[in-house]
Amino acid sequence: MVDKIQSRWPTLMNQVSFDERYVNYKDRDADTVLARRLSACNLGFVYTKNFSAKTKRMLTSATRSICATSTGNNIDFGIFAAMLRNCDKVGVNSKSLTNLQPVGGAIFEEMFNFSQRNDFFIRPTIPFVGKVRAITQSLTPSMVIMPRVNDDRFGPSGIATFNAVLSGIMPVNEPERGLYLPTDLTYNIERITRSVMHKYTDETTNMPVFMAIGPYNEMLCGNNLGNKYLPRNTAFNASSVLQGRKVGDKIAYDQKLCCCFWIGTHNETEYSVLTELQKICIRNGRASVIPDEMKEIAVIKIGVVPSNKSACASFDSKTLRIENFVFQPDHTWELTQYTDRRVFSAANVDTSDFKDVEGDVNSIFDYGYMEMAGTEDKILEEEEEETMDETPEDILRTSNLQFAQPIGNNKSSPMKREFTAMEEDKTETGDIFKLLSQQKPAKGAKSKSKKYKKTEEDLSAV
């Protein structure tokens, strides 16, 4: 059976090296560190675009080798995951990427250039340009790397190379062959156990394997994810959201991203997986932080698991290993955009303070306001009721507080409706301050003395 699979999906292999190991490592310690990362997930990625002249100079200076500018477009899964975790630094935050190697940091800077950092929406008629779309246009899965270092082959400056499968079935002669996936990031592991695989004998029932990129960490809250899943109350915490800004009539915000893997059935496609993951993200998101927030999810097929009795998989608490895996990555990602309409009730913030300038980097939400995203629904309902009971006098008295003015300017907010009703029904001129001046002074309040009034009359006479 293995020979039949081998003839159907021939193996194409090559030697690869990762030049980000020029810095922060000594001698062959870099190979040990990288091999440890590859034992958790041995999927490799390629940067499909060319480095700019500025980036090439930076890489040459950081790595002290010109080889990094020509062969530095290969990255392992560890660097790819680090890029996703650093996506909350795309905006006007600090650009220090201390946990990225020089090559990974260079690719990160190339993907999120000035346009990506400032112009999230290019034009109202052009689709939303977010971080996920920028990643899918620059990085694609390109290889399955064998975790063992080739001791007999070395690249430039003595850096060891790795065997990598570019396409086809995993080679039989490799002692550590197979696809390695993180257990905590893989959906539907039970589908490729031996008891389940024995049910499939038809060649048309090959199980596809997909990879997805989405919002952190809402996408990692499915019930069938690995051996455990994140509790719902941590699905959306404020620490993953740092800022938001508005361009045109849309709002984008900076958030960490994450990736996951999906073991599908023979009739599942990228679109069906995309739909399921979108439901998981919407269901497990605690609340919307800002009105009409736009999010993205991308899915790509990386290969299939042949339906035969020799196909086996084993997993522990960290790694899922699929031995007879056929690596057939697609060239394009399937991407979707969605908006969670469950707007945060206490966050009915007017966005008129955001300038209608494309890429207004000065329009940033306060981080303390973002922390309200983690409050319970019951507390939010109580706050909404208190807001409905406020009088115009209370609003004016607290106008110097944070967010009071934006909320009052919101046409859809309850306070704005009270202002409008008072202006139309109780006053002729519509001046709310005139209405308040006609009210009696509060008890204990001091009025103008007679002496002071007399002084005013004398001055007016003069």
UniProtKB/Swiss-Prot annotation:
Residues 443-453 have a biased composition (Basic residues). It comes from the Viruses. Residues 405-462 are annotated as: Disordered. Residues 415-431 have a biased composition (Basic and acidic residues). This is Uncharacterized protein ORF112.
